[in-house]
């Protein structure tokens, strides 16, 4: 019950006329169904003939105007999410059904506020299904990079024309993409094509980022006849430096004098912390 109003109270006016006005004590809720019941003893005419009243829920019922703006209930990625895929869609879930109106959704880079992509809400890259809006950027996000999303206040309305306030703050919906870049070999000792290499030298591999030892072999082969000098499982004690950018390989024996060798590395040998693999 929203309000019970005695017919004789000051909230009921118009006695002695054909029009009765009822003034409830408070404001009705937005977008809400109500019905009115009236006691059969509430109103009489001048000859004491009584109005029959209303006792059911259908004779006098109504729905109030929706005056509540839609709000953002959740998003994917969530605010402050990390490890987001570089090809991810942005999904906005609202408190009620919305329609795309006008304006843009803008994806910006956190470091310098540069615009990665500005997408008009009427574009086919923005799809609306009831209260869910899916944004499919045209490009691929950069790896290990912070972004934030701006939504114009004119972008989405509910069916009653109430507008979503939009997103204007840099910190309201921001996320960081995951590392999707494979580690690369930056340099080595000996260098490729080196001559005069010491017979007892270790092989040192310097990577573009820290790597972990995984599985597979490092094989040192004599180039002239493809004879294998040493096959070294990466998990053996002869391979050190896991978790760093520098891997050191200590062959079991001494290399032959004045002999050309080449090194092969399994593609499964080294991964970075997010399991991106060195190509080998």
Model-identified regions with their sequence ranges:
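Short intrinsically disordered, low-complexity coil segments enriched in acidic
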Residues: 1-20, 130, 279-280
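Acidic, Ser/Thr/Gly/Pro-rich low-complexity segments and short DxT(G/T)-type signature motifs
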Residues: 1-5, 28-30, 39-83, 104, ...
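Short, surface-exposed alpha-helix to beta-strand junction/turn motifs within ectodomains of secreted
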Residues: 1-12, 41-44, 58, 86-126, ...
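Aromatic sugar-binding surface patches on proteins
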Residues: 14-22, 128-135, 241-249
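Solvent-exposed, conformationally flexible loop/turn segments
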Residues: 15, 31, 85-87, 144, ...
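Acidic, Ser/Thr
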Residues: 25, 95-97, 138, 208-210, ...
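Short beta-strand segments enriched for Tyr within beta-sheet-rich domains
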Residues: 34-38, 94, 145-151, 207, ...
């Amino acid at each position: 019950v929203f309000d019970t109003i005695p017919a004789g109270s000051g909230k009921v006016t118009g006695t002695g006329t054909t029009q009765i006005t009822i003034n409830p004590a408070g404001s009705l809720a937005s977008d809400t169904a109500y019905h009115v019941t009236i006691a059969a003893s509430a109103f009489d005419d001048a000859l004491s003939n009584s109005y029959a009243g209303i006792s059911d829920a259908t004779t006098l019922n109504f729905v109030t105007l929706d005056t509540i703006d839609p709000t953002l209930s959740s998003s994917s990625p969530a605010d402050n999410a990390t490890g987001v895929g570089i090809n991810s869609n942005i999904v906005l879930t609202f408190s009620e059904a919305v329609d795309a109106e006008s304006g843009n959704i803008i994806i910006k880079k956190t470091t310098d506020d540069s615009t990665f992509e500005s997408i008009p809400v009427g574009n086919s890259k923005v799809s609306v299904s009831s209260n869910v809006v899916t944004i499919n950027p045209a490009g691929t996000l950069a790896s290990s990079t912070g972004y934030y999303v701006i939504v114009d206040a004119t972008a989405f309305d509910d069916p009653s024309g109430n507008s979503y306030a939009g997103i204007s703050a840099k910190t309201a919906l921001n996320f960081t993409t995951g590392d999707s870049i494979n580690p690369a070999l930056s340099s080595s000792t000996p260098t490729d094509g080196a001559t005069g290499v010491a017979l007892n030298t270790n092989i040192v591999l310097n990577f573009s980022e820290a790597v972990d030892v995984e599985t597979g072999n490092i094989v040192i082969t004599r180039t002239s006849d493809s004879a294998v000098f040493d096959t070294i499982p990466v998990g053996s004690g002869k391979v050190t430096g896991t978790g760093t950018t520098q891997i050191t390989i200590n062959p079991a024996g001494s290399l032959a004098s004045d002999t050309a060798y080449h090194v092969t590395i399994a593609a499964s040998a080294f991964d970075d912390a997010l399991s991106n693999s060195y190509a080998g």
